[in-house]
Amino acid sequence: MIRLRRLVHSVLSVGLCVVLVYVGWLMGESHRVVTFKLMPVALVVGEVEHPAHVVQRGGRRWAAEVISNRGVSGRIGRPGEQITASIGTLMDPLASPHFLHVMEGARVLVSEGWGQRIRMVDTQAMRVIDLPTASDLSLNAPHGICVRKNGEWLYIADSLNSRLVRVSLQSQRWQVFPDHDRRVAYGRQLLCREDGLWLANSYENRVGLHPGMGSNVLRINDFESGRSEVMAAFDDANMTGLEVVDDRWLLVGLWGQRQTIGVVDLLSESAVTYLPPRDDIAGPPYGFFFDTTSRELLVAYLGDIRGRSQTGGFAVYHVPHR
């Protein structure tokens, strides 16, 4: 059973709602209801225009601006202290920053979603450092990026090459995921988790991409094995971002006929729950970030990136403990 409740408040001049998603599941002979809650805290518009991804750590947020080719940083709750990082130079600008990964030592990795590189931002000096990679890596529109804690490898969804690669942060070594099942097509957000790599993967009508229909979430336990597992599939929509909450709830951003957030209970065989599309912000839900300390979920909304008639922003939700 799915039950939706909405309670409207005024926070930062933005209407908020409480969305309750109820997922019924069957265990043995007993039937009980398990609840997943998303409680909106704020909707931030105006500070960023077309963000693909927003992340936070240590009281500060970073946003990747797709159209303006910039990174934006600011303290949480203090919009007047926003800092804009000049990414690159006029002669060497960033080609549409898409996804971010916060590393140790005040460094943030940024993918060039419409370019060929991964860049590193020194957030203390607010300057950009080119990340050294092998000259023959030849990335094409890299999107999702992630690094495991204390890990050697940077994992990259190399979207227009229809592949998943990893690059050593200690040397010039790099490897391509063998993908024996030919499932990887146009990868967007990528998560590095203890239980493997999770990829938001879409089958789009583009030359050179692996064929397929709709989109799916792939999990890869062993990179060198070349094998992947389909965790969820959507026949009628492309996929943007994803996040896994409490090792149970898979959240995905959907673009197309369903321009909303889908919720999958990984511990049951129940159907996907689709949250109501938001009518207070433009564009599809794109990059996701779950802060396990504050239990805040940040969802970036692109706005209208084609006609550019409407800007986007990001929503902040609180996820209560079950």
How should each PLM-predicted stretch be described?
Residues G77-Q82, D122-M126, S168-Q172, N221-S225, ...:
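Short loop/turn segments that connect beta-strands within beta-propeller blades
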Residues G71-R75, L164, V207-V217, R258-G262, ...:
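Structural motif
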Residues P285-R322:
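Blade-level signature of beta-propeller repeat domains, shared across WD40, Kelch, NHL, RCC1
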Residues E47-R57, M91-M103, D136-K149, D181-E194, ...:
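Beta-rich, blade/repeat-based domains predominating
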Residues M1-C17:
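N-terminal Sec-pathway targeting helices
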Residues M39-V45, I83-M91, R127-S135, R173-H180, ...:
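A short beta-strand motif characteristic of beta-propeller blades
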Residues A63-R70, V110-Q116, I156-L160, L199-G212, ...:
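Conserved beta-strand positions in repeat-built beta-propeller and related beta-rich domains
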Residues E29-V48:
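A short helix->beta-strand "capping" segment at the edge of beta-propeller domains
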